[in-house]
Swiss-Prot record:
GO terms for biological process: cell wall organization; peptidoglycan biosynthetic process; regulation of cell shape. SUPFAM superfamilies: Lysozyme-like. GO terms for cellular component: peptidoglycan-based cell wall; plasma membrane. It is a single-pass membrane protein. It comes from the Bacteria. Keywords: Cell inner membrane, Cell membrane, Cell shape, Cell wall biogenesis/degradation, Glycosyltransferase, Membrane, Peptidoglycan synthesis, Transferase, Transmembrane, Transmembrane helix. This is Biosynthetic peptidoglycan transglycosylase. One of its GO terms (molecular function) is peptidoglycan glycosyltransferase activity. It comes from Rhizobium meliloti (strain 1021) (Ensifer meliloti). Its main location: membrane.
Amino acid sequence: MPAGRWTATRRTWRSRRRRLVFIVLSVLILPYALIGLYLLEFIHPVSTLMLRDLVLLRGYDRQWVEFDDIAPVLVQSVMMSEDGQFCAHAGIDWAQMRGVVEDALDGEQTRGASTIPMQTVKNLFLWNGRSFVRKAMELPLAIAADFAWSKRRLMEIYLNVAEWGEGIYGIEAAARHHFGVSAAKLSRRQAALLAVSLPNPIDRTAGKPGRGLRRLAAVIERRAGRSGGYITCLYD
């Protein structure tokens, strides 16, 4: 290959490599910039699943609702079901995480350790499915979100982007779809059913619960009724 042509080829590869590095860095940095942007309470974030539905021309149902317009029994139920230490940790429940790692090293089936901040950043910026790459991105993002946002703002965003059925996002759309009421009017049992459906909202239908889901909801309803000491960061 002539020297001039070889030099041109090298320049082309360097240019492509620089572009690739720029794209990768942009993808990694963008979520942190958005975390800062979402400090502004008039901005209503959307999740990656909502964006997917838009790209696929499916559409979705999401009606943003402010934290104070969500029934406290729903907040209590979600905390007791998904992240009982939400007010105590700084984005990651390290005790739970350590237990998961120990179970994995022992070859045992691992239990969930995703906190509400972790689930929120996953919904906003990442993708579903188990992946070490996703988890490595999720952990620092959860810490950043918990540091930047108030606990009330974090919970508000989480409850407005969580999936509660095919094309159903956010607690207002979920409450109206499954029970025909607003998020402010949910009963204790309805709130518990919505909370326990969160891990698998496609297969677990809050509005038409099976026996197993009703049993889980009864447990969460009892825990929510005793959750006063766990929710001090959200209610005065």
